[in-house]
């Protein structure tokens, strides 16, 4: 047993300079786990509650000292003496201590910090790398890195309406080859933008964030960059979008403020269809607002046999919302963010529910990140086949990509790159 001996939380900073929670958990056998909690910029309304202090005179109200206090004074006394390896019992206890549907008392950032720290301590106690501890002997598939090389929306002061333009290097034999291709396209894109006289400053996730005349301009520049880097758009490298449409949806009018005009759902659906007919787009995240269940079901029915539709704000890594989507036929892919649901156990439950019902899963970072690399190990452990963790720039993003390189090397000949198989809905189109 990895009996918990001590738990201690402190306030640290994330990649945007905002406070977040760090938890250190020690076990009696000498193992130690570190839990670092990320934070999002565009967040779903149904996400688990992130506890902030609210004192505007300190960090603009974004301090997390109350969440730290919840760990040190409420959670720690209850979990000391428990087996850190009994992840479900530990997480269930913290959820029970909180007693709210959205972790609205202790805070998801408090609970997740302890949950992650226990996970790491247990892996160290067992003498296993995290991906092997979580996934057992079957974790062997390296995910396709969906790399956010152009930032817009809430990640870049709305340089474009669409929040993320990602490249997906699926047409390669190994993860390391795919990563190299993505990096080369990223650097080539910088030169393409410079030649056009555009700003090459970076957004929250390391992608370029120039102000564009239209959302489609970004796609054209990315296509140019893929070709200029010596790769074939569509065959080797596809495009994924995170529209994050809830960010420009008006609840009062039921319309989307898109490309400077008020657009209804029917227009947006047609727009997406035209877009995928013109560009090698294989995945669209949050094409409709987070409560637009009928619109989600409509686009999945119409285009779901040729495109991956990823639920982020819609599903918030919540098994209950995912089950509703399954019942309605809304979306066909789950975005996985640990802090959206707030515990390791619930995250794993969501992935398993998605897999059992034919949904793909894309493990994801947040815009406010730390050097933590849990999501890299998680993607391999559960063979999710996809990960998104920003551009190949900024240390907190690159750390995740580098961790996958390490795992690929450790796995040796048993490592398999997901490649085309990552995009189940697009298989017959990618085969062309």
Curated annotation (Swiss-Prot):
- Reactions it catalyzes: (2R)-2-phosphoglycerate = phosphoenolpyruvate + H2O
Pfam families for this protein: Enolase_C, Enolase_N
Per the record's keyword annotation, is Cell membrane included, yes or no? no
Entry binding sites for (2R)-2-phosphoglycerate? 163, 337, 366-367, 388
Primary location recorded for the protein, binned into one broad class: cytoplasm
Give the subcellular location.
Answer: Cytoplasm; Secreted; Cell surface
Kindly list the cofactors needed. Answer: Mg(2+)
User: Which EC number(s) are documented for this chain?
Assistant: 4.2.1.11
The answer to whether keyword Metal-binding applies is yes
Named in its record, the pathway it takes part in is: Carbohydrate degradation; glycolysis; pyruvate from D-glyceraldehyde 3-phosphate: step 4/5
What are the alphabetically sorted keywords of the record? Cytoplasm, Glycolysis, Lyase, Magnesium, Metal-binding, Secreted
Family, per the entry?
Answer: Belongs to the enolase family.
Instruction: Report the HAMAP family cross-referenced here.
Output: Enolase
In Swiss-Prot or TrEMBL terms, this protein is called: Enolase
**Originating species:** Bifidobacterium longum (strain NCC 2705)
UniProt gene name? eno
